[in-house]
Design a protein with these regions (language model features):
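C-terminal, active-site-flanking charged/polar segments
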Residues: 1, 43-46, 64-67, 185-217, ...
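Contiguous transmembrane helix-bundle modules in multi-pass membrane proteins
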Residues: 1-87, 309-314, 321-324, 345, ...
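Loop/turn elements at helix/coil->beta-strand transitions in domains of secreted/extracellular proteins
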Residues: 7-9, 99-103, 169-172
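Extracytoplasmic/lumenal acceptor-recognition loop(s) of multi-pass membrane glycoenzymes
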Residues: 62-81, 94-165, 201-228, 233, ...
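Short, polar loop motifs at secondary-structure junctions
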Residues: 110, 175-181, 408-411
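Periplasmic/luminal catalytic loop of GT-C fold multi-pass membrane glycosyltransferases
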Residues: 148-191, 199
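Catalytic cores of secreted or luminal carbohydrate-active enzymes
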Residues: 165-170, 191-261, 356-372
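Active-site-proximal, structured, solvent-exposed surfaces of multi-pass membrane proteins
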Residues: 253-477
Length: 477
């Protein structure tokens, strides 16, 4: 079209100006690249239209630019490192003989493929990066359990060293190097990679008679909400009982800060980090030493993408708030941490470059001994068989209670107890559950996509219409 001079340059210019205004208003961090591309493209179009002598020259230049861009863009692609392949092989060897149906968290390499189960069908993960994952589960993780938000958007759910979350979500196994988390013991090691196990965690499915009313639960704040979740089933019809917490609050003094990086400046509640990974080292208050430490505060300001994201890491547990112009702004204004290291005496706090307005700083602690017996007050469910979208289980519970799963609730689930369909409901703010009378029961949990049949019918109709339309076009020819 350009070579034949059939392009309307005035119309193209008008539309381009409108597009430029939209880009300018949008204030994307990539706007400058668009402006450069726009200017170069218009120069090339002008010479191709009005300077015939330069047609071949600019065609060559255009091809060179495209080739150069392609090479630079593809240069960013990286092959899988041999060390990653070695890690994966070590992990496969470590987990191949595990015969329990439990969850596993890979803490060795956060970039590991979260959907890879390494050949062991008994192991599951509750970490995913997907726009199609359960919105109910996503909301539970970040808004109910107040788990650390480690990434630039909420769609990424990656492993954490949060002992409360690990125990609640049935993470019996961890894989990594030098893991020092309460409750986990090394049971095998290959090379530099170790397999750790914690038998104190809640099972994949269980029955509990300890219930807590959802309205009362919604009034709780971090970290008390996590403690109640570990010890109760949250339901609409739960008990209105008073919960006796084991969590205690402690206070941080300025004298507890033992080291301040030269790139950090502190003024009242504002911390200025002049350089990436600037750090503080803070002594843990004496009452909280060796305990599970909870930290929470509000980050009341934001900053431009010209500076970058805001992030604070405490002993490797990171919370991130995206810069203001980022298209997937995560809105993380409340930073919470669960520091689960054994022998905890001090914490290292690291900052990305930026200005941090920190308000309402609170510290709490709890002993691991106060939560390690959570699975003593429930009845574990036997998972007899998994066949496609069907889970067959059995349980003998000594009193009436709730059958609790760690499966995100969905309308597609059907539950049969001793062959009879029962009503399901949302428990623990996200999971599939239902009431279960005391006694010995055989239970089948089935899943069928709610709109699967409609989707199949519409697909068939679409194929028929496509064939019919092409047949008519063929006849006309």
């Amino acid at each position: 079209t350009i070579f034949n001079k059939k392009i309307d340059i005035k119309k193209l210019f008008r539309y381009s100006v409108i597009l430029l205004l939209i880009v300018f208003i949008g204030k994307s961090s990539y706007s400058n690249y668009f402006y450069i591309d726009y200017i170069i493209s218009f120069i090339i179009i002008y010479f191709l239209l009005y300077k015939n002598n330069y047609k071949k020259t600019f065609t060559v230049i255009y091809l060179i630019l495209l080739t150069t861009y392609s090479v630079i863009a593809n240069k960013e692609d990286k092959l899988v490192k041999s060390s990653v392949i070695k890690d994966n092989n070590e992990i496969k060897e470590l987990v191949k003989d595990i015969d329990t149906i439990d969850r596993i968290a890979f803490l060795k390499n956060y970039s590991i493929n979260v959907n890879n189960i390494f050949g062991n069908i008994n192991l599951y993960q509750n970490y995913v990066y997907s726009s199609t994952s359960s919105s109910l589960y996503n909301k539970f993780v970040f808004d109910v359990f107040d788990r650390e938000m480690q990434h630039r958007n909420r769609l990424i759910l990656s492993p954490v060293k949060n002992i409360m979350f690990l125990m609640f979500m049935n993470n019996r196994y961890l894989v990594g190097e030098n893991i020092n988390i309460h409750g986990y013991k090394e049971i095998n090691k290959i090379g530099n990679t170790s397999l750790y196990e914690n038998t104190d965690i809640l099972p994949f499915m269980y029955v509990s008679s300890n219930t807590y009313n959802i309205n009362n639960y919604n009034k709780l704040s971090f970290p008390y909400n996590d403690e109640v979740l570990l010890n109760n089933v949250i339901t609409n019809n739960g008990d209105n009982k008073h919960y006796n917490t084991k969590i205690k609050e402690v206070f941080l003094r300025r004298s507890d800060i033992k080291y301040i990086d030269t790139n950090i400046k502190i003024e009242n509640n504002v911390i200025y980090s002049m350089k990436r990974n600037s750090k503080l080292i803070i002594d843990v208050p004496s009452d909280a030493k060796g305990k599970i430490l909870f930290v929470s505060f509000n980050l009341s300001n934001g900053q431009s993408c010209s500076i970058g994201d805001m992030a604070i890491s405490i002993n490797g547990n990171i919370n991130k708030k995206t810069c203001n112009e980022w298209k997937y702004y995560n809105g993380n204004d409340s930073f919470t941490y669960v520091i689960s290291d054994k022998d905890l005496n001090s914490v290292t706090v690291e900052f990305l470059k930026g200005e941090y307005h920190i308000d309402n700083l609170r510290l709490y602690y709890i002993s691991y001994d106060d939560i390690k017996d959570i699975n003593k007050n429930i009845t574990k469910v036997n998972i007899d068989k998994i066949d496609g979208d069907n889970i067959y289980t059995s349980v003998n519970n000594i009193e009436d209670g709730y059958f609790v799963t760690s499966l995100p609730y969905d309308k597609g689930y059907t539950v049969l107890v001793d062959g009879k369909k029962v009503e399901t409901e949302i428990v623990n703010k996200y999971a599939l559950g239902f009431k279960l009378d005391k006694g010995n029961h055989n239970i089948k949990i089935s899943y069928k996509s709610p709109f699967k049949n409609i989707g199949i019918i519409l697909s068939i109709v679409g194929i028929v219409l496509f064939v019919f339309n092409n047949y008519n076009l063929f006849k006309k020819k």
